[in-house]
Amino acid sequence: MENIFIVQKSFLLDYFNENSSSFPDKKEFMITLGALCGYACQAAARLEQKGYLLVKAAGKNYFFGDGVNYYLLESSNSFITLMKKKFESMFKNNDFPDFVKILKNVASNIGNKNYKINGLFNPEEKFPYYLKVWNDIFDIVKKSSNKPEGWPVVLTLVLDHFMNVFFVCFGGKELITLFPAIIENAFYISKMIEED
């Protein structure tokens, strides 16, 4: 199982390396990886049929509940757990972003057309692009784990890999400022649903 996981992670790294030119800049690339981690948390929760609630805001449905929160926040390999470990290994003398505050901010702004991730962009406008990338990589993601609970982990490990690359190429100062946006985008996109 672990060997399959490593091979599929390698295929995902190849995909992102080959398609990196389609990302306008390095920061957007990292934030996109965060979005994919968030969406993988939702996909796992839906397919594992963990508890969830569809909430309507601004005429759209959004995905809330314990199921997605389990993969985002609570499991031993949750997105936040892995991101916190990464942050602490890279920035020992800095505090990890207040993810509870970020999560509350996201929850209170779901569906707000004027909301911007870290003041940069509206996630609703980026969602179709994130779905396209998700659909491009979904077969590889499925092969990475025979259980959906592994999907958020493999994508978070891909993000971890590219954080290492980013750190080496551009330094820690830029990366540390990206952490809140990566987390915020993951949280927001974990709530979004592909509408028919």
Write out the residue ranges for each language-model feature.
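Solvent-exposed interaction surfaces and binding hotspots enriched for charged
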Residues: 1-196
